[in-house]
Curated annotation (Swiss-Prot):
Involved in ubiquitination and subsequent proteasomal degradation of target proteins. Associates with the CDD complex and mediates the recognition of specific substrates for CUL4-RING E3 ubiquitin ligase (CRL4) by interacting with ubiquitination targets. Binds to the abscisic acid (ABA) receptor PYL8 (required for ABA-mediated responses) and promotes its proteasomal degradation. Acts as a negative regulator of ABA-mediated developmental responses, including inhibition of seed germination, seedling establishment, and root growth. The keyword Protein biosynthesis does not apply. Pfam families: DDA1 (PF10172). It is found in: Nucleus, Nucleoplasm. GO terms for cellular component: nucleoplasm; nucleus. InterPro entries: DDA1-like, DDA1_dom. It comes from the Eukaryota. Residues 15-28 have a biased composition (Polar residues). Associates with the CDD complex, formed by COP10, DET1 and DDB1. Interacts directly with DDB1A and DDB1B. Interacts with PYL4, PYL8, and PYL9. Interacts with SGF11. Residues 1-48 are annotated as: Disordered. This is DET1- and DDB1-associated protein 1. Its main location: nucleus. The keyword Nucleus applies.
């Protein structure tokens, strides 16, 4: 069993070389290294404010789907209703199924 799990990337300590401990006294909290530009071509605008969402993304999607279900459907227009008048539906022929008996 160990040979099957031996090639997994989690056993390779070099996979985690990009992380450094945020606090040397507590090495369990790892934070990734961040990019610090050496030029100002990619600096964000000075008035930019980054905020986090108050609602969790999963809860937000539940609320959005619930609102979509509650939203009233639009009524069919007269133009669409006129097209469907010309359609004829087949009657369920019970006589064809009884003829074989």
């Amino acid at each position: 069993m160990a040979s099957i799990l031996g090639d997994l990337p989690s056993f390779d300590p070099h996979n985690f070389s990009q992380h450094r401990p945020s606090d040397p006294s507590n090495p369990s909290k790892m934070v990734p290294t961040t990019y610090r530009p050496t030029h100002n071509r990619t600096l964000p605008p000075p008035d930019q404010v980054i905020t986090t969402e108050v609602k969790n993304i999963l809860i937000r999607s539940f609320y959005q789907r619930a609102e979509e279900k509650l939203r009233p459907k639009r009524p069919a227009t007269d133009h669409l209703a006129a097209e469907h008048v010309n359609k004829h539906f087949r009657a369920a022929s019970s006589s064809s199924s009884t003829q074989g008996l």
